[in-house]
Structure formats: structure tokens, C-alpha cells
């Protein structure tokens, strides 16, 4: 149900009143919408950065005379168009990512949120996250984003070591990072997430753990740990290939991850996903939608989405990718109302593979009820109950299959990639042997 314009403008005020509310249950995750429901999350991509970090191969550009008013107008148009095409009536969360969305004007954020609230129901307590870098996130700017409707921040600290920050090509220092973190916590208490990278060239376990322990003395209730991935085409990849830097040691990275998980658990953090840790119920409801294979709309250059185009008469979930280059994307939005470059219908098996691979990233795993929303006939017991490989994984203490569903143990989360090889193979085998059904796809 669309909101009248006056109600849309009042959304920010209502959101600020509701943002202190937090679910008391810290053992599960946010409720997952049915796969073909009229609910979705919304991702908004801001494509610009001050500079390209040495490790990054994301779709981002260094701004040269950006017409933000034109970009803002196109973000608004595309959000409204995709909401109409998808038939989505309720937006559960909004995430402004990039790029560096903290470089955007708060007016752009407000305009997108107002457009969403006009086209669909955006609850006052919806999670609205903005990614921020310390050098573009002064206290006054953060306050302005809060006034625009943002109620959660994700700060890309990456490291608290100045030498490592220089290696990564970051524009901030460790001191900048800590100052931004303190200001963010003052403005968004209990709703600030921080990223910390591990597995850098020449990085050692002890110094990295001391960084993490230092961060825990001043951080909020959400921490993400990301292992460096050397991506072809990045400066860091070239430096390692040419021998200017040592290749990251995967065994050391695995040790950092294991030790880091233990430190976070000791500090009261729940590892609710492979890379994400929260305490006091501070899970990211937006990212939870991804892991539970809920629908999400991707707005902006290069954004990805997964939804059923019900508003256009569709019945099959599609993977959608928007045009990468900002100028080309804006031209398409002005011509067609959206800049979708590629639409790939997902088969029933492809969707189930995503449900399995994404769901097992979480500590909750895949409940029987959740699986049946996507596949009512072939149960988790049918798939894995008699599997020799699954029994072996259970005996090793890595996997659990019981009355709740299928999930990794705490030890299993650390080696999920190796577990998925057996599980996906078993799913594919069982799918080929099944009796075809007429169950509609979600």
C-alpha cells in the first residue's frame, strides 16, 4: 500500500522514534518472507569513491564532475519502477552501498527513501543502513544522514594499523577510524557495524588479534570479519604477482579467523553468519534477507537483484543486473524507467541451490519450514537423511540434521565451502531422480 506524500515525508520522523527498538530474541534471525511474497529488501548502489583501494574490484568510479541531481533523479525513478514491476508492497530494509555512499548528499538518501515510502509501505522501524568511510563521515555529515532517515551505519575501518591501511590504499588513518567510530556511536547508539580485514600480505596472527581486541574495547554490537581476496586487475594482485609483496598465507588467515571467532564469542558476540558477529540482537536484517533467499531489489549502476516480476505478470524469480557504467545507466533509466541490463530466470534447482548455499552460511541454517516454502515435496530428510556423506559430516561434528532442520555447527561454519561440495552434489542427484511436480517456482 503506497503512502500519501504527507505520510512519506513524515516517515523520517517516525523512523527516528522507532530506531531504538530492537528484538529481544538473540537466538534466531528476523522472520523470513515467503519466496513469492510482496515483501523485499532494497539495495541502492552509489558508484563513486574518492579513490580506488588497492584490493577492490567492485563497480566503482572516481568522480569527475558528477551531476548528483541527475543521479538522484534516476535512483528515484528506478526504485519506483522496480517496485512496480516486482509487485512489492512492503520494503523491509534499505541498504545504501557502493562505492562510498557517505560521499553522497544526505538529500539524495532522503529523496530515495521518500520515493520508496510513496511507492510501497516502508515501516517506521525498517533498518536503513549506510556504508561510510572515515574520511567522508564527519560528525555533521553523519548527523545529516540520520536526519535523512538512516538509522544504521556500516563503517569500513578494515584495519587499525596505519601501515596496513596504506597497503590497502585507504584514505584514512587508524586515528581517523576511531574518531569516526566514536562519533557514529554517539549518533547511532547500538546500530554501528565495523569491518575488519584479515589475511593481508605479511600480516601475522598476534598483531592482528591485538587489533581485534583493541577494536572490541570501543566498538558497538556488530563486527564483520573479511578475509582478503586477491582479485585480478587490482593493484594488490599485481604487486603480489610481480613479487613486490608476499602472497597472503592461507594457513595464517585460517588461524586468524579461528582465533578471531573465539575472541568475539568470548566477548559475547554471536556468530550468526560466516563473516558476521552480533551481540544484543544487533543482526543486520537486510543481509539476513540475502542469506534467507528473500526477494531484494537492486537500484543503481551495477546493482544486483532477485525477485519475481509479479507486477509485470511474471511467476519465476529472476536474477537481475543493472547496467554498470553510471552515464549509460542514467540514459537507460531516463528512456525505460530502469537500467536493467540482464535478466536471468532461475530454474527450480538453481533457486534451491541458492537456498542451500546461502542458508548454511548462518548459524540457524535451513529450517524445515523455510525449505518447504521453496520446495514443498522434497524434504530435507528426503535429501540428506540417508546420505552417507552427511552422516560422516555429522559424526565429525560439522553438520546437524534434526527436527529443527539442517545447519552447520560452530566448527562447521569455518569450513562451509568444503561441506557445500557434498551437499550440493547430493541435492543435484536427488533433483534428477525426483518425480516432476507442478509446484510453482518461488
UniProtKB/Swiss-Prot annotation:
Binding site for S-adenosyl-L-methionine 1: 43, 98, 131
Gene3D superfamilies: Aldolase class I
InterPro entries: Aldolase_TIM, Coproporphyrinogen-III_oxidase, Elp3/MiaA/NifB-like_rSAM, HemN_C, HemW-like, rSAM
Molecular function terms, GO-annotated: 4 iron, 4 sulfur cluster binding; coproporphyrinogen oxidase activity; metal ion binding
Keywords assigned: 4Fe-4S, Chaperone, Heme, Iron, Iron-sulfur, Metal-binding, Mitochondrion, S-adenosyl-L-methionine, Transit peptide
Region (Disordered): 1-37
Residues that coordinate or bind S-adenosyl-L-methionine 2: 99-100, 158, 170, 195
One cellular component term from this protein's GO annotations in UniProt: mitochondrion
Keyword match Nucleus: no
Function, in words: May be a heme chaperone, appears to bind heme. Homologous bacterial proteins do not have oxygen-independent coproporphyrinogen-III oxidase activity. Binds 1 [4Fe-4S] cluster. The cluster is coordinated with 3 cysteines and an exchangeable S-adenosyl-L-methionine.
Family: Belongs to the anaerobic coproporphyrinogen-III oxidase family. HemW subfamily.
Protein name, entry field: Radical S-adenosyl methionine domain-containing protein 1, mitochondrial
Organism: Bos taurus
Gene: RSAD1
